[in-house]
Amino acid sequence: MMKLKSNQTRTYDGDGYKKRAACLCFRSESEEEVLLVSSSRHPDRWIVPGGGMEPEEEPGTAAVREVCEEAGVKGTLGRLVGIFENQERKHRTYVYVLIVTEVLEDWEDSVSIGRKREWFKIEDAINVLQCHKPVQASYFETLRQGYSANNGTPLVAPTYSVSAQSSMPGIR
């Protein structure tokens, strides 16, 4: 299913959830620093770069496209962290790891809407996301669980259902 928004086509899965893709963009393979971008709706808040998938677009391709548009970075797409449901907003987001190899000086959203980007230590990123984007904060917990459960790499990408209302989202 598709719906037209003023500047894009939104795609939905069979359950009516908007199909999205995002990346945890790390400065290096050590995955100690992650890149967050300012929200287009609330420029004083930080978010994980990502957005809606286009018709017929694969999740990994969408994730790479979105981070280039929103964060102005390119890199090596890594593992799928998981597929996260935001029941409140009816989104399903495929979240990947991306190791940044190129940082653009000017990029689409910096020019069009003045979007900013900043590197954060993982704990700091979790803290800034927790109050207004708890679903996104949960990406990092899932990343940690994947490391411990499978010695560094998740074998199967699980689907997580989280409520954006809780201060510490529960994974069901």
UniProtKB/Swiss-Prot annotation:
Function (record text): Cleaves a beta-phosphate from the diphosphate groups in PP-InsP5 (diphosphoinositol pentakisphosphate) and [PP]2-InsP4 (bisdiphosphoinositol tetrakisphosphate), suggesting that it may play a role in signal transduction. InsP6 (inositol hexakisphosphate) is not a substrate. Also able to catalyze the hydrolysis of dinucleoside oligophosphates, with diadenosine 5',5'''-P1,P6-hexaphosphate (Ap6A) and diadenosine 5',5'''- P1,P5-pentaphosphate (Ap5A) being the preferred substrates. The major reaction products are ADP and p4a from Ap6A and ADP and ATP from Ap5A.
Keyword hit for Nucleus: yes
InterPro entries recorded: DDP-like_NUDIX (IPR047198), NUDIX_hydrolase-like_dom_sf (IPR015797), NUDIX_hydrolase_CS (IPR020084), NUDIX_hydrolase_dom (IPR000086)
Family stated for the protein in its record: Belongs to the Nudix hydrolase family. DIPP subfamily.
Comment on bound cofactor: Binds 3 Mg(2+) ions per subunit.
Organism of origin: Bos taurus
Taxon lineage: Eukaryota, Metazoa, Chordata, Craniata, Vertebrata
Active-site residues, as the UniProt record annotates them: 69 (proton acceptor)
Chain ranges for the short sequence motif Nudix box as given in the UniProt record: 51-72
Domain Nudix hydrolase positions: 17-144
Modified residues (N-acetylmethionine): 1
Cofactor: Mg(2+); Mn(2+); Zn(2+)
Localisation per UniProt entry: Cytoplasm; Nucleus
Oligomer and partners: Monomer.
GO BP terms, alphabetized: adenosine 5'-(hexahydrogen pentaphosphate) catabolic process; diadenosine hexaphosphate catabolic process; diadenosine pentaphosphate catabolic process; diphosphoinositol polyphosphate catabolic process; diphosphoinositol polyphosphate metabolic process; RNA decapping
Keyword Nucleotide-binding attached: no
Catalysed reaction equations from the record: diphospho-myo-inositol polyphosphate + H2O = myo-inositol polyphosphate + phosphate; 5-diphospho-1D-myo-inositol 1,2,3,4,6-pentakisphosphate + H2O = 1D-myo-inositol hexakisphosphate + phosphate + H(+); 3,5-bis(diphospho)-1D-myo-inositol 1,2,4,6-tetrakisphosphate + H2O = 3-diphospho-1D-myo-inositol 1,2,4,5,6-pentakisphosphate + phosphate + 2 H(+); [phosphate](n+1) + n H2O = (n+1) phosphate + n H(+)
Name of this chain's protein: Diphosphoinositol polyphosphate phosphohydrolase 1
Any matching Pfam family: NUDIX
Primary location: cytoplasm
Binding site for Mg(2+) 2: 66
